[in-house]
């Protein structure tokens, strides 16, 4: 008989955000979007800033914003080790918009002291937060 669920743990340095049985996980890996379901091949990959859409064993969904991290898939267990993880409901749209504006302003600064890689990463995190907020407002 095929597996119907797999165990998922989502943890950050601050806390454990999710632990339980799931039907599926949609997440942004370093090479693009990933769909993880029971029976998925073992995998280890880095994660980009974005949304983790969790479909729990009972069919309900939970959305978590991830700033990046690592994903490990084993036969009966999936682990997300996030740099920073926040439940979508706890994201602050105004703060994300302000962070995006700051990053864009820093990107357009004409000084030689701009660390473009750091500014681009800051911009990617802010845009990813806004996408999660928009996706969850459509979901609700």
From Swiss-Prot:
Signal peptide stretch:
none
List the protein's name. ATP synthase epsilon chain
The record, for NCBIfam families, names: ATP_synt_epsi, PRK00571.1-4
Please give the function described in this protein's UniProt entry: Produces ATP from ADP in the presence of a proton gradient across the membrane.
| Gene3D superfamilies for this protein | ATP synthase delta/epsilon subunit, C-terminal domain (1.20.5.440), F0F1 ATP synthase delta/epsilon subunit, N-terminal (2.60.15.10)
Q: Which UniProt keywords apply?
A: ATP synthesis, Cell inner membrane, Cell membrane, CF(1), Hydrogen ion transport, Ion transport, Membrane, Transport
Note whether Ion transport occurs among the keywords.
yes
Query: What binding partners and quaternary form does the record give?
Result: F-type ATPases have 2 components, CF(1) - the catalytic core - and CF(0) - the membrane proton channel. CF(1) has five subunits: alpha(3), beta(3), gamma(1), delta(1), epsilon(1). CF(0) has three main subunits: a, b and c.
Gene that encodes it? atpC
Q: What Gene Ontology cellular-component terms does the record carry? A: plasma membrane; proton-transporting ATP synthase complex
**Which cellular compartments is it found in?**
Cell inner membrane
Bilayer topology term: Peripheral membrane protein
Give the Gene Ontology MF terms in alphabetical order: ATP binding; proton-transporting ATP synthase activity, rotational mechanism
What Pfam families does the record point to?
ATP-synt_DE (PF00401), ATP-synt_DE_N (PF02823)
Similarity comment: Belongs to the ATPase epsilon chain family.
């Amino acid at each position: 008989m095929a597996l119907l669920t797999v165990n998922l743990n989502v943890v950050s340095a601050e806390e454990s955000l999710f632990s339980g049985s799931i039907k599926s996980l949609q997440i942004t890996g370093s090479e693009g979007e990933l769909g993880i379901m029971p029976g998925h091949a073992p995998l280890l990959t880095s994660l980009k800033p974005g949304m983790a859409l969790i479909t729990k064993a009972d069919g309900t969904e939970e959305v978590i914003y991830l700033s990046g991290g690592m994903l490990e898939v084993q036969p009966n267990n999936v682990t997300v080790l996030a740099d920073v993880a926040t439940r979508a409901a706890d994201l602050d749209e105004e703060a994300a918009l302000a962070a995006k504006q700051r990053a864009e302003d820093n990107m357009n600064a004409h000084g030689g002291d701009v660390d473009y890689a750091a500014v681009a990463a800051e911009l990617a995190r802010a845009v990813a937060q806004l996408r999660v907020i928009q996706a969850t407002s459509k979901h609700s």
